[in-house]
């Protein structure tokens, strides 16, 4: 009997670890990525994607629109559950890395944009699925060491399998130590897991969603 498997995708971590450097990879078919990564003796019963909606940024004027197109594409393709956090803007005072001169002020007033709740939402979803006995195997796509606590709980208390696929190129020794199985995602793997350039939907396929040209 195949193991019931749920895949949890940390969108923020995946983006900065694997997708940001290659615009074409942003048009990623998350379901297909999960199917490629998960061993064949497992049955994927859910793929859960945790992300936050981008706020308008004059430095990246198309980012919000492109993300909305992508989220609609995922919805139309199906097979993905999306849970959203949010971005929070904060005024902050930060020190210069190097003091410019002895008489200069060593701090600058900056605006910090921080992604909130995605990691908490992911960890909470794992715990709920564990306690409701929704899965035998838990697969996490993230390099965030903050997830060690739920990983340990599910492994040690529940005696379930927890697999971590790290989207970053660097090794996360902490995650590797705590997971049942750990692997860094190959840098070229997203090229095999992209959505179609055009996704048709509607009763007769009369409507369509297109990959943003900047992501081609």
Regions found by a protein language model. Give the residues of each.
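Nuclease catalytic cores that cleave nucleic-acid phosphodiester bonds
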Residues: 83-216
């Amino acid at each position: 009997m195949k193991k019931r498997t749920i895949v949890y995708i940390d969108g923020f971590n995946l983006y900065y670890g694997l997708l940001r450097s290659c615009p074409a990879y942003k048009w990623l078919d998350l379901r297909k990525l999960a199917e490629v990564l998960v061993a064949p003796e497992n049955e994927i019963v859910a793929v859960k994607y945790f992300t936050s909606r981008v706020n308008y940024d004059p430095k990246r004027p198309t980012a919000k629109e492109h993300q909305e197109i992508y989220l609609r594409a995922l919805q139309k393709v199906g097979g993905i559950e999306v849970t959203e956090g949010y971005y929070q803007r904060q005024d902050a005072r930060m020190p210069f890395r190097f003091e410019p001169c002895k008489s200069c002020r060593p701090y600058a007033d900056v605006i910090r944009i921080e992604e909130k709740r995605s990691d908490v939402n992911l960890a909470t979803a794992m715990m709920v699925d564990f306690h409701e006995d929704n899965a035998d195997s838990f697969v996490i796509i993230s390099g965030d060491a903050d997830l060690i606590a739920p990983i340990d709980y599910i492994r040690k208390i529940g005696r379930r399998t927890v697999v971590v696929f790290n989207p970053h190129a660097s090794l996360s020794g902490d995650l590797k130590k705590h997971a049942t199985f750990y692997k860094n995602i190959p840098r070229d793997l997203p090229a095999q897991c992209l959505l179609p350039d055009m996704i048709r939907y509607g009763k007769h396929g009369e409507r369509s969603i297109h990959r943003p040209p900047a992501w081609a």
